[in-house]
Regions:
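Non-cysteine beta-strand/loop elements that form the S-adenosyl-L-methionine
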Residues: 49-54, 165-167
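Residues at the starts of beta-strands that form the adenosine-phosphate
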Residues: 24, 47-49, 92, 138
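Residue-level detector of alpha-helix initiation sites
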Residues: 32-33, 46, 56, 122-123
Length: 204
């Protein structure tokens, strides 16, 4: 048993740890949302991930993403896997350095219990989320997380299998830059929604 799982045993029952340890989470995008969602879920007992991102780590990512200066230039999915393995050596990550689109999304995440939308551009986020409507997967998305001191984050259940978090108003741009506090807040809400779904659905 790893040090992390030993410590989690103080807070979670063996049954809960087993349930979390069996779940596989797909994450589309390994940037500010995706990298932090993965880190938060790992620290909460998730051990299996599918990480999809074609980009490389840049210096401008370090203000809000779960990477170190020495990761700059590396593929995000692989760099994230390495960071996660430092916390939990037994983590299982399948990494894909590709762009997610309508032709490959379902196959990439086919065996996942939950799919997390963690893409950057509004158009890509909307298109990705629309792919899953009626497919039967549980999807957790985000919308509106730029700036600082702006409207509070919300969690909206948009049907039985779709949750979206954010302020639903503030896109990250020049006037409302993506800064760590609100990005992390959205990522934490996404991770919490994933945990709640896994633990509650498996108990019912």
């Amino acid at each position: 048993m790893s040090v992390l799982r030993e410590g989690l045993g103080r807070y979670l029952s063996p049954a809960a740890l087993e349930t979390l340890g069996r779940a596989r989470i797909g994450i589309a995008g390994a940037g500010g949302l995706g990298s932090n969602v993965a880190m938060l879920l790992l620290r909460s007992g998730i051990r299996h991930f599918v990480l999809v991102d074609r980009d490389r780590v840049e210096a401008s990512n370090l203000n809000r993403q779960f990477y170190w200066p020495e990761d700059v230039g590396k593929r995000k999915a692989e760099a994230l896997m390495n960071r996660l393995s430092q916390i939990e050596p037994g983590v299982d990550c399948r990494c894909h350095a590709v762009a997610v689109n309508a032709s490959n999304a379902v196959s990439l995440f086919s065996d996942c219990d939950v799919v997390v939308e963690a893409l950057d551009e509004a158009g890509h986020k909307a298109a990705f989320s629309a792919l899953w409507l009626g497919v039967g997967y549980y999807v957790v998305a985000a919308s509106g997380l730029g700036g600082y001191g702006l409207p509070p984050m919300q969690v909206r259940n948009l049907g039985k299998s779709f949750v979206c978090v954010g302020d639903f108003a503030t896109a990250a741009d020049v006037d409302a830059p993506p800064l760590a506090p609100r990005v992390m807040q959205a990522a934490a809400l996404q991770a919490d929604a994933v945990l709640a779904h896994i633990l509650i659905s498996k108990q019912n």
